[in-house]
Amino acid sequence: MLKQVLKIGLGISVVASTLLAAPEKTKLKIGFIALTDCAPLVIAKEKGFFKAEGLDVHVAKEGGGWPGIQQKVISGEYDFSHALAGMPIAATLGINGNAHLQALLSLDFNGNAITYGNNIIAEMEKYGLDKTKRPVSAESLKKYIDAKRAKEGDNYAPLNFGMVHPVSTHNYELRYWMSASGIKPDQDCTIKPFPPPTMPSNLIAGNIEGYCVGEPWNSRIVLKGKGSALVTNYDIWNNNPEKVLQARADFVEKYPETTKAVMRAVIKAQMWLDASWENREEAIGYLAKKNYVKAPKNVLRKSMSGTFLYNKGVDSANPMFNVFANNYAAYPFYSHGMWFVTQMYRWGQIDKPVDMKALIEKVYRPDLFAEVAKEVDYKLPPSAWKKDGVDEYNKFLDGKVWDPNKAVDYIFDFKVQNSLVSKEDLAKANNWSVETKQPGYVCHYGPAGCADPKYITK
C-alpha cells in the first residue's frame, strides 16, 4: 500500500495511507465550546489535517453551552462535537438528552481547576486555608460551612457554586474535592450549571462563590485579581479523562469512512499539540482568534505552555495541565468511561440498576480507535481496561483506587454519596469481570504534556 508521511512537528511524523477509502460525506459541521481543550479540533482545521483527509469541515463555536452542543448533535445539526466525557453516556441512558451517542476518542486529559472568589477565600483563611499549599484540601471550607450552619441554624443559606453541566467532569470533580473533606454537596451547597465563558462574570456579580471550569476561565479571574485557583483536576485525579469527540451512533454506522477520516485528522492534531512547546505557542495564536476561544494570548499561555496560574503573579510549573496525545490521552479507555457511570450513581443521577460494562461498551469505541490508530501511528495501550490510583501518574487526591472490577463497591465505599439504587440491586446487574492491564507512563510524541523528558520515547 502506498504511504505518505505528514510532518506534524519537531521530529514527529504521522504515516497515513493514500489509499484509504474515501469519506462518504465530506462537508461536515463540528461543534465546540470556547475552551482551550477544543484545541485538537481547531488545529485539525487550521493545520490542514481535515483537508488532507478530503474533508470540508466547519468548526462551529457553540454559544448555548453544553446543553446547546448536546441538542445539536442529537438533532443532527452537528455531525460531531467537542463533548464532556459523560455526555454521550448520559444521552444513551436518557439523561440530559435521549439518543445513542458514542465517544470516538478522548480529546485530552486534565485541563480544569476549582477557582474561588476573594470573599470566600478570606472566610476559608480564617479556618486554616493556605492557598499556596499543594494540593489544597476543602477542610477549611468544611469548617467555614459548619460555623455558618451553627450561626444561621434553620435559616442556613447554602453556598452557591458553579460547574458547566450536571454530567460534567467539573461537577464530579467539585463534589469529589468537597466530599473528601466531609462536605455534603447537595445539603451544604447549591451547585448550578453555567456556560464556561460566563463563570468569571457570574463570580464577579456575586451569583456564585466559586466554580470548577476549564481554561482559560480560571486564569481569567486570577489575572483580574478577583480570586485564586485552589486546585486543578490533575491534583484531584492525575491524568483524568476530560473531553471526548462524540457523534450519533447511527451517523457512525452510516458514514464509517467519514468517521474514521475525522478521527485520523483529530488524532494527528493531538500528536502535533504534544510534539513541542513551540507548537503549543502556535496553537495559542489560533485559539485567541474571535471565532475560537477569543481570549488574550497571555491568558491562554498560563495553562497551555506548561504552567498554571493558581495565584496572581505566580506561575507554577504544571506540564501536564493539558495533555492531548501523550500517555495515551487520545485513547477512549472503557474504564475511564465507567468511572463516570459510578459518579452518576454516587450522586443520584441514575435511578435504576444498569449493566455498567454493557453500557460503556455500547458508548465508548476503543475498537474503532484501534483501527484508526494504526493508520496514523498512534501507540495503543495494552488494554481498554485499567485501574487508576495505583501508578505514579494516575493517583487520586484521597488515595482511593478505581478498579472497574469493583465498580459497585467503589460507589458505596464513599462516605458521602446519594445513590438512588441499592448496592444489592446494582450488584445483581453487574455480575461480570474484566482483565485489567496497566500501561506504563510514556510520552511517545514529544515534551509538551509530559511529566519529564526522560519519559519521551519516539
Residue ranges and their predicted role:
Residues 22-186, 190-193, 205-219, 226-239, ...:
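Short, glycine-/small- and polar/acidic-enriched structural segments
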Residues 114-115, 244-247, 251-252:
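Short glycine- and hydrophobic/aromatic-rich loop-to-beta-strand nucleating segment
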Residues 338-458:
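Conserved C-terminal helix/tail region of periplasmic/extracytoplasmic solute-binding proteins
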Residues 254-370:
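Secondary-structure end/capping motifs
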Residues 12-21:
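Hydrophobic h-region of N-terminal signal peptides that target proteins for export
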Residues 35, 63-67, 82, 165-169, ...:
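Soluble non-cytosolic domains of exported or imported proteins
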Residues 2-11:
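Sec-dependent signal peptide recognition
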